[in-house]
A protein has these predicted regions:
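Flexible "cap/lid" subdomain of the alpha/beta-hydrolase fold that forms the substrate-access gate
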Residues: 25-55, 60, 64-202
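Conserved HGGG/HGGXW glycine-rich cap/lid loop of the alpha/beta-hydrolase fold
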Residues: 1-27
Length: 202
């Protein structure tokens, strides 16, 4: 959904575009919060790649899609022929550090649930932290949140935020280091497209 306008500008008569939604988000099946791990997301997306029986692909990944997608491709390395990377990262921090004040706040048990599930919907507030707030209309915010609430996946955004490693000993750190090591071995055409107004990764 995030890249719907980008896809409209691609030569769809020449390329096949596949945009999987992360399991537990969108209209996918409900995933218990405890199952949102880097390893599981990698395994799930790799299963999608296998099911589609793809021969080769050019990968575009942003945010969590970067490491999860690369991790999935590390399990099927012959597929990857090129990459476009957008505001994402690979590897794990070598010191204790929070990605953002929001991540620092919601990682605390109970506090995170209170903020994201009781006090307000994070989708209603995302426009406040966008480089172009006008692009985040009420209708768009509702479309982002609707599948999560309709499918009982309201805990998924918080679980994904807590997956972000805040230090070398975080539960996600080992998987992220492996992804970073894999990326270092790649010798493929690649482009980096960076949005400087990204409030988290810009």
């Amino acid at each position: 959904f995030l890249y719907r306008k980008v896809v409209e500008g691609l030569p769809l008569d020449k390329v096949r575009v596949i945009m999987p939604t992360s399991p537990g988000l969108g209209f996918s099946s409900k995933i218990p919060a405890s199952e949102h791990t880097v390893e599981n997301h990698i395994r799930w997306i790799n299963a999608v790649l296998n099911e589609l029986e793809l021969k080769e692909l050019i990968y575009a990944g942003q945010d969590w899609g970067g490491p999860i997608g690369m991790g999935a491709l590390s399990l099927s390395p012959s597929l990857l022929k090129g990459a476009v990377l957008l505001n994402t990262g690979f590897g794990a921090p070598i010191t204790n550090v929070d990605l953002s004040p929001a991540h620092a706040t919601v990682k605390t048990p109970v506090i995170g649930e209170l903020i994201t599930e009781v006090l307000f919907s994070m989708f209603d507030r995302l426009g406040n932290v966008q480089g172009d707030p006008e692009s985040w209309t009420t209708e768009v915010a509702e479309l982002y949140g609707k599948p999560l609430y309709d499918n009982g996946n309201a805990k998924a955004p918080l679980a994904m935020m807590r997956m972000v490693p805040d230090g070398p000993n975080h539960v996600s750190a080992d998987a992220m280091r492996k992804i970073g090591d894999y990326v270092k071995t790649l010798d493929i055409p690649a482009e980096i497209v960076w949005g400087m107004n990204d409030p988290i990764l810009g």
